[in-house]
Amino acid sequence: MTTHLPSPDRSGPRRTRRTRRPFARRPLSSYLTGCLAVSLAVSLATVAALAVAVPAAAPATAAPLPADGPGVGTPWVVTLGDSYISGEAGRWAGASNSDSDRADALGPSAYFDNASGTGETIPRCHRASSAEAYIGGGVEGLNLACSGATTATSTGTNFKPGIDFYEGSAGKGQARMLQEAAATRNVRMVVVSIGGNDFEFASVVQSCVVNFLTSPTWWKNYCHDDSSVAANFTAANVADVRSRVVGALDNVATAMSNAGYSTSQWTLVVQTYPSPVPNGSGIRYSESGYTRQSTGGCGLWNRDADWANSTALPTINGALLGAADDVGLPNVRTLDMTHAFDGKRLCENGVGLYEEVGLPSWQSAGAVDRTEWVNQIRTVSTIGDSPYYVQESLHPSYWGQLAMRNCLRQVWNAGSPRSGSCTVGNLGAARLTPSGEPSMVLGPLE
């Protein structure tokens, strides 16, 4: 599910060079304008069916060349799920509060994925070209994930295809799209990241930010003990979401079987979610005042940040890992992203905004090491002619997307997929690979 500020809808963000005034201390209500719609649920885009190239005419005596399909032709990786795999926030490399151009790596067409490159196939799926699906090296990528998707398709204001076989006037579910795509491609690996929106994580973050902005340091109102938040993490709800994820994974297996694949011809990779913020002690802005949100875009009390890492994230990822076991397939692997951004998270000590670390832009030497890999939680900065979307909040930005791609390439393992946990290589001195990605390490599963 995706929520947004009550500002005029835009078919795509406009690239405008603008200088924002320093955040002045105003009545609290000013800071709350639009912040009730912080969205984490983010982005998948359906793709138009690709025409299979017809080989040149052969002598009449030659056997016809086989068309690409199960086990035949160029290998493909397909990604399914929600915003954490679709490419949401993949436009922005770090952040600046003074000039958006300093962090604008992909520009206003960042999420254009239709055949002509002129717009989105599904509005607000936000499938960026920096998304992890495109590992290269002779492997083709197809991104069917959608920002805001849950395990089941939603046909509300914005169509959000789930991992099911839905087909209607609004579009198709991701499992149906996978089945159709796999019939004419040699799909060797399907990567799934889903479940966060089933846990209502967007509304959880919304509650945490609102509680931070509306309570004083001497009487902190925490979100982790709000009944609306706690309800998402009861044993009953965790079991329910785990069951839904199992159903989604079963749908993936059914789609591949219907397309003509045996389990030995492809691998299912279940991908967990990364921690987007450090514990409270690792946040570089004080709890006092509004700087933590107005400057850093990370308006959480320390205890809520600690809870997010000690309880919320492990619970969500545990449900995914449990579902991977429950589905009972012999071709399942796991990519654990829990600590993939540690040291580069939003508001974390050791990294900062471009103006804080003294770098001109994302193209500056060392930018990948000194700036954040997770996008700010945005509120009033999305109003008017802003190039930002609320739904980009708290998602892997350009560096984060490329880091996950580097991890996934290691999982692909030259066509022999393996499981693993991903972390930053050379933490504190992160560097780019020759392909322009952060160098990551795939270690054993924790």
Regions found by a protein language model. Give the residues of each.
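Short, solvent-exposed loop/turn and secondary-structure capping segments
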Residues: 70-71, 87-93, 153-157, 201-206, ...
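Secretory targeting and sorting signals
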Residues: 2-64
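A structural motif corresponding to the C-terminal end of an alpha-helix
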Residues: 130-141, 241-268, 304-336
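Catalytic nucleophile-elbow at a beta strand-turn-alpha helix junction centered on a G-D-S/GDSL motif
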Residues: 75-92, 100-104, 197-199, 398
